[in-house]
């Protein structure tokens, strides 16, 4: 038990050291299309970087299309990219990401593409330069998984789906 705990502690320390090394002020980005725009945050303090379309794409009612952004990024080890929906597109036009959030692994170097789904009863056309999603950069933890006979007990236990009440 002690050896196992020590191994976990060493991994946690190594992870923190890695994170301190990867959280820099810059991130390498390649624009892979002439109409590509560098992802940017709309306001200081915003967490997400806007991703824009490099093609005009019409999405039929209840249809799904793959929207290219013309952007590729080099995420450092220990950091993942989450592609998330834009709330305004969802509320005003019924557009969302089919696989929200989309996951970009740090070893992926290809173009970021957005799986946009139209839940509305009318078609929607994405124009070149339209903001179609947001990119959130986040650290992650990827420990080795181990099978145990029983999980440590908590106050909640196995209660889920509505177990905390309505109000």
Predicted regions and their residues:
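DUTPase catalytic domain/fold
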Residues: 2-167
């Amino acid at each position: 038990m002690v050896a196992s705990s020590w191994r976990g502690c060493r991994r946690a320390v190594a992870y923190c050291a890695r994170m301190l090394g990867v959280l820099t002020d810059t991130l390498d980005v390649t624009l892979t299309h002439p109409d590509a725009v560098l992802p940017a945050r709309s306001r200081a303090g915003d967490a997400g970087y806007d991703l824009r379309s490099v093609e005009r794409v019409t999405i039929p009612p209840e249809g799904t299309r793959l929207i290219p952004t013309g952007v590729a990024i080099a995420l450092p080890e220990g950091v993942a990219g989450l592609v998330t929906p834009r709330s305004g597109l969802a509320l005003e036009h019924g557009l969302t990401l089919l696989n929200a959030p989309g996951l970009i692994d740090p070893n992926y170097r290809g173009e970021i593409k957005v799986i946009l789904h139209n839940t509305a009863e009318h078609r929607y056309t994405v124009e070149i330069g339209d903001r179609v999603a947001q990119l959130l950069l986040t650290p992650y933890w990827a420990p080795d998984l181990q099978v145990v006979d029983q999980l440590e007990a908590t106050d909640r236990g196995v209660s889920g789906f509505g177990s905390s009440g309505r109000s």
